[in-house]
Amino acid sequence: MNYVFSTTDTVVYRFPTHVNELVLDRSESTVTEVFIVVLEPGEAPPLHKHPDTEQVFYVLEGEAELRIGPEAAEHFRVKPGDVVRIPPDTWHKIANDGRVPVRYMSVDAFPGARPADEPTWDDHVRAICAAQSWDFASIKRSK
């Protein structure tokens, strides 16, 4: 059993909209997963929600705009040192509207247990790729 996980020895997932650096796979935990999100200037994942997941973000570098709600009507400025909580089933997105990369740690918690239909991070990424018509093999990379 692992107790310590490195943020520098990660598996990288380069989506068309952002990068995720996997630190702790959900398969190695009871109800959590951890990854670093990197947004280059102009990048933003699409507005989305997770019905079965609460997310906590810790902003490490850069400033970004957090948008909340189905119409992304609520706007918040986030900066290094800020902690963001996204309750389950909440529409959200973080957009890098600046000139330098944004990095934040995401800790995902699954109330009760991790999703049975996506027991690993790779399973989750495959589902995202299928929904977006992205190629999984081109997204998963070593760091």
Residue ranges and their predicted role:
Residues A44-P46, E65, V84, P88-I94:
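Histidine-centered metal-chelating micro-motifs
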Residues V34-V38, V56, H75, V83-R85, ...:
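Conserved hydrophobic/aromatic beta-strand scaffold that supports enzyme active sites
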Residues F35-P51:
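Conserved short histidine dyad/triad with adjacent acidic residue
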Residues K79-P80, P88-D117:
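Ligand-binding loop in jelly-roll beta-barrel domains
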Residues L24-R26, P46-P51, I68, H75-R77, ...:
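Short histidine-centered beta-strand/loop micro-motifs
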Residues V56-P80:
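A short beta-strand-loop-beta hairpin characteristic of the jelly-roll/cupin
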Residues V19, E43, D52-T53, E71, ...:
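A generic "binding-loop/recognition-motif" signal
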Residues M1-E33, P46, P115, P119-K143:
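A short, N-terminal "cap"/entry segment at the start of jelly-roll beta-barrel domains
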